[in-house]
């Protein structure tokens, strides 16, 4: 019975993978590489470069690294501290980042990078795809807590964006308040013209 259920799960994951587009597959490859890098304790960018080199020779039977994967992995590596800080901030007291399954960390980092550093991806898409990766890779509890973490990061970013807009609007209003209004300026011009005219008549 257990073997049948395992086979069914694998079949379901395979079918789900086929339904997803190229970007999902690129995210999936990025998770694989980040997981491998942590397991081997090496720079994930080195793995990307290695795979790119090996893929040039068909005899190696290495799949080409998608362009988006080549963007994600260095992005995560470069901004790792900021990503981990954002993730840790939204973990419940029951979870600690360094004690999470390595695959969960990889999924969270990929999705968090998209939220924080890739404006081309709509935030909700980054969240949904991250949860989907968790469903495919990790344990049953992973999707729900990963969704909560990513949703928290997204809300923080939206709040920061709203505050920037509010600050810019306030600064603009303050600048306008310091300048004479158009009506006052016109009135001043009229008074000056009157003074000049009286001077000419005199």
UniProtKB/Swiss-Prot annotation:
GO terms for cellular component: cytosol. GO terms for biological process: DNA-templated transcription termination; transcription antitermination. One of its GO terms (molecular function) is RNA binding. Keywords: RNA-binding, Transcription, Transcription antitermination, Transcription regulation. It comes from the Bacteria. Residues 1-21, 169-202 are annotated as: Disordered. Residues 1-11 have a biased composition (Basic and acidic residues). HAMAP family: NusB (MF_00073). Involved in transcription antitermination. Required for transcription of ribosomal RNA (rRNA) genes. Binds specifically to the boxA antiterminator sequence of the ribosomal RNA (rrn) operons. Belongs to the NusB family. This is Transcription antitermination protein NusB. It comes from Corynebacterium jeikeium (strain K411). The lineage of its organism: Bacteria, Bacillati, Actinomycetota, Actinomycetes, Mycobacteriales. The gene is nusB.
């Amino acid at each position: 019975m257990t073997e049948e259920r395992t086979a069914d799960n694998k079949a379901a994951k395979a079918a789900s993978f086929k339904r997803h587009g190229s970007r999902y597959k690129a995210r999936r490859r990025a998770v694989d590489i980040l997981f491998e890098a942590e397991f081997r304790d090496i720079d994930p960018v080195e793995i990307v470069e290695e795979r790119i080199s090996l893929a040039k020779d068909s005899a190696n039977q290495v799949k080409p690294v998608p362009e988006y994967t080549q963007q994600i992995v260095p992005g995560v590596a470069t901004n790792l501290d900021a990503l981990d800080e954002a993730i840790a901030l939204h973990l419940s007291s029951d979870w600690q980042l360094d004690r999470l399954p390595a695959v969960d960390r990889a999924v969270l980092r990929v999705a968090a990078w998209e939220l924080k550093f890739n404006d081309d991806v709509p935030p909700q898409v980054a969240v949904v795809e991250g949860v989907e990766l968790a469903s495919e890779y990790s344990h049953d509890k992973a999707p729900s807590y990963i969704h909560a973490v990513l949703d928290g990061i997204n809300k923080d970013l939206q709040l920061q964006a709203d505050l920037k807009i509010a600050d810019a609007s306030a600064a603009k209003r303050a600048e306008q308040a310091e300048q004479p209004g158009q009506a006052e300026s016109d009135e001043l011009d009229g008074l000056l013209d009157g003074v000049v005219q009286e001077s000419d008549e005199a």
